Amino acid sequence: MIPPEIRRSVLLQKAIKLALAGTLLTFASFSATAADPSSDTETPQPPDILLGPLFNDVQNAKLFPDQKTFADAIPNSDPLMILADYRMQRNQSGFDLRHFVDVNFTLPKAGEKYVPPAGQSLREHIDGLWPVLTRSTKNVEKWDSLLPLPESYVVPGGRFREIYYWDSYFTMLGLAESGHWDKVADMVANFGYEIDAWGHIPNGNRTYYLSRSQPPFFAFMVELLAQHEGDDALKEYLPQLQKEYAYWMEGVETLQPGQQNQRVVKLEDGSVLNRYWDDRDTPRPESWVEDIATAKSNPNRPATEIYRDLRSAAASGWDFSSRWMDNPQQLSTIRTTTIVPVDLNALLYQLEKTLARASAAAGDRAKASHYDALANARQQAIEMHLWNNKEGWYADYDLKNNKIRDQLTAAALFPLYVNAAAKDRAAKVAAAAQAHLLQPGGLATTSVKSGQQWDAPNGWAPLQWVAAEGLQNYGQDDVAMEVTWRFLTNVQHTYDREKKLVEKYDVSSTGTGGGGGEYPLQDGFGWTNGVTLKMLDLICPQEKPCDSVPSTRPASLSATPTKTPSAATQ
């Protein structure tokens, strides 16, 4: 909508109308459910909506090797004016699209390559990276896709110039280990602010991430802060914990058995579980061309359906994995929204338990009992519907075929991580993980080689942490040590050779970064730094901490803070 106080020439007004018409026409071809820019003036619109045909043309022209570059570009003036100008110029002889972009946008700066001081140990390198990866965005440009946050925060690194939801918890583990409790508190405050502002924590603090969330680790973040601040942290963030829970459970009251609404599903027996969901069904701005190509490769499916499933996989954090596909070699067979993920439901169980604890800390016994009952119901649903009795591991539920899926993934360890697994089942999961996923360099994400980054042979720091902690929770200390030791050795060998930590690792050996996926391997790297530092302190005694991974395997892991076990673990 053009502000009334701005006076423009008749010609320019006509051009703007043309531009807007083109924008609406462009997006009608992608989805009828795309957000209406005028429906909520408080919610900033992503660049694909702000710029319409210009955004589409720039991305399709592949002006930049990484599609995220233009998604992060900042318009130098009102996008409507730029769009109108583009509509007038683009058919003129000699029009240069790249020149037009350079004149009208500020492109993101290439990250300065961090050169660490020579001779640093692994610990020294990580401690030195915290200030390098710290950002502050209290004030941003008016049309920037970056969303402002009140406090400073730590980014993952590389192409990821913003904060990411689930990444941040594992980064915060390292910050706490380094004694940076002020930064931990700042990041929890930022996520609380986002919940208050948007009703949920978006995938990242970009406008184009607002339509989805990510694995809900906010409860873990608050629990981490409570280790330092006590129950005051639980009481302070109880309202935000409740709001996040409301976001994930929106629409549950009206669901009939067999129905789904956004992020919540009700199975035929009345069990309530959750799935990943994105509110939009258009190509992702940060992967525009790739998503369009994926949809075109499978003309038998509606493009909007594929776009939604791609976006929902991004919400899962596992973008992409054979876990979500019918054919692991064909991304267009992805159907994330028809799969009930075991890890998501384990995390929501943890959220319910944290809500119960926070309510009790606030003196509300009735609410504490209410959330405990919800957690118990979810735990029963996990045991009933997300356990593959034939294979002997936790797995995802297939809504389309109304049955448990057979694939073993590292997500099977999440019920152990949140203490929601039965003891006998935890032992079976440990045996399965050791037999099928444990590799020389750590725990593989799956056993499938699809070329996607959340598949074999890649291993990711957060999944190593979840597995090791979950196994320890159930007395599977030897397997937990193997996961920890092998992954740390992989990180150390890679660091020794390249003097950096990376986003993911090839766990089929040691000393090699991972591959696959939509973009090159990224350096930094927030969650790897955090998990590595935490694991270093677990394999070395407190009285004699180690700065690098020891050359010989320790006998056992150091003790970690005890989590309250659920009834299932007794």
UniProtKB/Swiss-Prot annotation:
Region (Disordered): 544-570
E.C. designation(s): 3.2.1.28
Cited InterPro entries: 6-hairpin_glycosidase_sf (IPR008928), 6hp_glycosidase-like_sf (IPR012341), Glyco_hydro_37 (IPR001661), Glyco_hydro_37_CS (IPR018232), Trehalase_periplasmic (IPR023720)
Coiled coil: none
Pfam families: Trehalase
Localization per record: Periplasm
EC class name: hydrolase
Key word Zinc-finger present: no
Residues holding substrate: 159, 166-167, 203, 212-214, 284-286, 317, 518
GO cellular component, one term: periplasmic space
Keyword Cell membrane in record: no
Residue ranges, compositional bias (Low complexity): 554-570
Catalytic reactions on record: alpha,alpha-trehalose + H2O = alpha-D-glucose + beta-D-glucose
Signal peptide limits: 1-34
Enzyme active site: 319, 503
One GO molecular-function entry: alpha,alpha-trehalase activity
Swiss-Prot/TrEMBL GO biological process terms: cellular hyperosmotic response; trehalose catabolic process
Record keywords, A-Z: Glycosidase, Hydrolase, Periplasm, Signal
Family: Belongs to the glycosyl hydrolase 37 family.
Assembly notes: Monomer.
Function of the protein: Provides the cells with the ability to utilize trehalose at high osmolarity by splitting it into glucose molecules that can subsequently be taken up by the phosphotransferase-mediated uptake system.
UniProt protein name: Periplasmic trehalase
Protein's organism: Salmonella paratyphi B (strain ATCC BAA-1250 / SPB7)
Gene symbol of the encoding locus: treA
